[in-house]
Amino acid sequence: MIKFLSALILLLVTTAAQAERIRDLTSVQGVRQNSLIGYGLVVGLDGTGDQTTQTPFTTQTLNNMLSQLGITVPTGTNMQLKNVAAVMVTASLPPFGRQGQTIDVVVSSMGNAKSLRGGTLLMTPLKGVDSQVYALAQGNILVGGAGASAGGSSVQVNQLNGGRITNGAVIERELPSQFGVGNTLNLQLNDEDFSMAQQIADTINRVRGYGSATALDARTIQVRVPSGNSSQVRFLADIQNMQVNVTPQDAKVVINSRTGSVVMNREVTLDSCAVAQGNLSVTVNRQANVSQPDTPFGGGQTVVTPQTQIDLRQSGGSLQSVRSSASLNNVVRALNALGATPMDLMSILQSMQSAGCLRAKLEII
């Protein structure tokens, strides 16, 4: 009766507040994907394959494949092939994958092929880090890009040297699983957070009894489970559907230095400050002045004299006030009022954080 009342109170509290399921915040330790890789050949290309004179490994791979099929290529034969390409094939072996199950594969050219459109991947073994074959891949490649070339001009949309084969590999070997062994399981938070880890442990203890879950650190919650696969599956199904109140996220600003993009979450706040940003531009203009003699047969020489002009300009630099902002919309308005470009905004945010005006973590990727 006490457990029922506790569960009812927890349900009413989580319904009134913003809550998320435990399954959306955590994953089960040990239940993960495993990467597979393989090397193979793509055939059937419309003259867009590897130039075999520049990619000898393509010819060598083709000779090995033909010899396995009982076809012997005379030594010294120079095969000029345009419809074959050497590729790398990658896939992910899902957790609890069983023999006969199909998985998607990604095919990427490793030579100088122009396009893989219309090609067919020949049977390719996919291996794990232990060099064991776990799947076999084969099938027609779907390329999302398009392109055409003629007379030295070319037009291309998206990428042509990579494609995907849906359900293109069949699992041939299963990975041993430790699921169901032991009386404890670890739930791992997607993002480390001490308060969230403790809150999840408290939620499980209120419903399943105190001592059922323990927060080990900011990312790991250890849960006591019954023995046996079926019992643990039912226990996890109940736990993962429990809801917990989501704690506020850490204020963070992420800057991509390569693209100039700036992303911030709603917890970012600003304190009042003054910002001055000046743009410094340098323009170098170089011209060649040609000096020729006035008389054609006077014995003079033509002289080329380079003339270089450097122009230095500095604009902006006026001091502007930034008001204190507590919401994301106000932060955006305050930063837009500066009239800075994304590249300028990156340096402004760094300076604001150093001055203590930006209440957020600054992450540059």
Swiss-Prot record:
Keyword Signal: yes
Coiled coil: none
Protein name in UniProt: Flagellar P-ring protein
Keyword Transmembrane among UniProt keywords: no
Broad class of where this protein is predominantly found: periplasm
Cellular localization per UniProt: Periplasm; Bacterial flagellum basal body
Keywords assigned by UniProt, alphabetized: Bacterial flagellum, Periplasm, Signal
Source species: Escherichia coli (strain K12)
Physiological role: Assembles around the rod to form the L-ring and probably protects the motor/basal body from shearing forces during rotation.
Pfam families: FlgI (PF02119)
